[in-house]
């Protein structure tokens, strides 16, 4: 096995580090050349003292004072590494150190990227995963499908050759999914998944949060802009349109409760349509057409309203048609679905080329 540099990003993982370092020490005891770079975000939980007390010369600690974030910590570790084979793994004990030789063998056999996979044949997770965590993982994997066909693109246990990561386009990761960033930016085409058993952490707290999930969505948008520059605005545009359907139905329900028979149905529908268009405009401007030229927001809004008027009219009349046959919110769902589907590609093309055109 060739010499390996193992990068371990940490934040408040002092309780987990001894087990991880013991596992890595056992690999060295088998005669494999391996060093470890721990990149810690100034945890102040005893990490510095723990590494110093162990006194292992093959373990190097880098403490970052002002920087934060797992992905940037990994990049710092890659920059500080010494060997040509690079492995990144979590400190919490979820990744088995015993799989590192298998990952190195995959790279030696010609893979340009390898990762420890829970979902390939032979991989597994511990019992006790809740339904929400399972759904979260599957949805995140589905969202990564336009960028890679691997079964576990969310894995944080990855291996890469130094020459491969150094050819990367400008790395701009956010959140925790540095592996997906490297697969896309390094243009990795031969990705090999190594089956692993993913263990539940024994110490510390999980870093998964709503903020992390939001960062993942932003990351997906960034990667789409990189890999599919001509079509990258369509994905967030479609997502905003889908959210607009929910907003539209919710507004109709709210107006139905607040106004009832005091306000004509067509007025309630019109108010809901205009508010939904404003919602879509604000989010499209931020997510889909972020690179638009320097036209004023007022002119962009006016143009957006005009362009969207055709599918909006369809939405309006379909909702009105069904409003006396079924409850208004359900009529809004039907109208919004038909109008949004008909107008999706038309709105995207015209808004991209005219309203939000690049300078």
List the predicted regions and their residue ranges:
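Short beta-strand/loop segment that forms part of the nucleotide-sugar
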Residues: 25, 32-43, 62-64
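Hydrophobic helical membrane-anchoring modules
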Residues: 1, 171-250, 284-310, 320, ...
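Cell-envelope/extracellular polymer assembly enzymes that use nucleotide-activated donors
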Residues: 3-5, 35, 181
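Short aromatic/hydrophobic "clamp" motif used to bind/position activated sugar donors
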Residues: 86
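Acceptor/aglycone-binding surface of glycosyltransferases and processive sugar-polymer synthases
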Residues: 65-80, 97-176, 201-206, 211, ...
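Short, well-formed alpha-helical segments that are part of the catalytic scaffolds
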Residues: 13-26
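A conserved acidic beta->alpha catalytic loop
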Residues: 40-48, 93
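Conserved donor nucleotide-binding strand/loop of the catalytic core
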Residues: 34-35, 48-80
């Amino acid at each position: 096995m060739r010499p390996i540099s193992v990068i371990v990003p940490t934040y408040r993982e002092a309780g987990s580090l001894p087990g991880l370092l013991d596992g890595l020490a056992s690999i060295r005891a088998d005669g494999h050349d391996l060093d470890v770079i721990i990149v810690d975000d100034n945890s102040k939980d005893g990490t510095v003292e723990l590494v110093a007390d162990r006194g292992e010369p093959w373990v190097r600690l880098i403490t970052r004072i002002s920087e934060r974030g797992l992905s940037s910590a990994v990049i710092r570790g890659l920059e500080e590494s010494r060997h040509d084979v690079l492995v990144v793994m979590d400190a919490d004990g979820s990744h088995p150190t015993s799989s590192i030789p298998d990952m190195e063998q995959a790279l030696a056999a010609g893979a340009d990227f390898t990762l420890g996979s829970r979902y390939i044949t032979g991989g597994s997770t511990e019992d006790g995963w809740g339904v929400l965590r399972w759904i979260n993982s599957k949805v995140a994997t589905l969202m990564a499908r336009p960028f890679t066909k691997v079964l576990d693109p969310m894995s944080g246990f990855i291996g890469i050759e130094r020459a491969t990561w150094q050819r990367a386009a400008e790395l701009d990761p956010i959140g925790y999914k540095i592996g997906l960033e490297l697969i896309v930016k390094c243009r990795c085409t031969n990705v090999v998944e190594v089956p692993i058993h993913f263990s539940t952490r024994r110490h510390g707290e999980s870093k998964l949060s709503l903020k992390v999930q939001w960062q993942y969505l932003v990351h997906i948008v960034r990667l789409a802009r990189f890999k599919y520059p001509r079509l990258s605005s369509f994905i967030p545009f479609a997502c905003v349109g889908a959210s607009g359907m929910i907003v539209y139905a919710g507004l109709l329900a709210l107006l139905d409760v607040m106004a009832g028979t005091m306000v004509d149905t067509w007025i309630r529908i019109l108010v809901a349509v205009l508010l939904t268009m404003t919602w879509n405009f604000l989010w499209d401007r931020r997510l889909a057409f972020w690179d638009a030229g320097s036209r004023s927001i007022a002119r962009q809004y006016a143009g957006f309203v005009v362009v969207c008027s055709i599918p909006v009219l369809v939405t309006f009349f379909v909702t009105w048609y069904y409003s006396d046959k079924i409850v208004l919110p359900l009529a809004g769902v039907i109208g919004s679905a038909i109008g949004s589907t008909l107008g999706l590609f038309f709105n995207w093309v015209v808004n991209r080329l005219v309203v939000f055109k690049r300078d």
